[in-house]
Amino acid sequence: MYDLNYVKPKSTNDAVSEYQKSSEGQYLAGGMTLIPTLKSRLSSSDLLIDLSETSISGVTISGKTLNIKAMTTHSEVANSSDVKKSIPSICDLAGQIGDHMVRNRGTIGGSVANNDPSACYPSAILGLNATIKTNIREINADDFFVGLFETSLDEGELITEFSIPIP
C-alpha cells in the first residue's frame, strides 16, 4: 500500500470538501474492496476519506418507500425490522453476504458504488427500481449502472441514500 493521508469528517459536506482538496482522494465506506485493492497496489490514493462518522446510516420507511442510507452495514440491513416488513428479500440478500466480519463492516453504499458484477446489491437495486441519492442529485437505478465496475457517479460525487419503492 502506498503512503496516504486519512481523514474522518463528521458530515457529508466535509467529506466532499476533503475530496475536492485532494488529487487522488477516495471515499472509504466499509473498505471491503478498497483496502485490498490499495494493499495490492491495483489502485492508489493520496487521501482516504472515512465516512463512518457521517450521519448517513440507518433505515426508515416513508409512505410506500423504504429508505436505506449509504453507510448502513449489511448486518444492519439484514436485521432491520423496517426492511423485514417492507421488502424481506433484501434482508435475506444482506444476511448472505460474505461472512459475519464482512456483514458487520461492509456497507450497501460501498457495494453499489463499486458495482462489482459479483455483488448482490446492484442487481437488487436495479430490479427494485430504486433511486440512488447523492450529495448533488437523484439517479434512477436504470441510469446509474453503466458497466462492470462503472457507474454514472461524477468525480467526487457521494452516495447518501437509496429510496426503494415498496411493492
For each of these PLM feature ranges, what is it?
Residues 1-167:
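C-terminal structural segment of proteins
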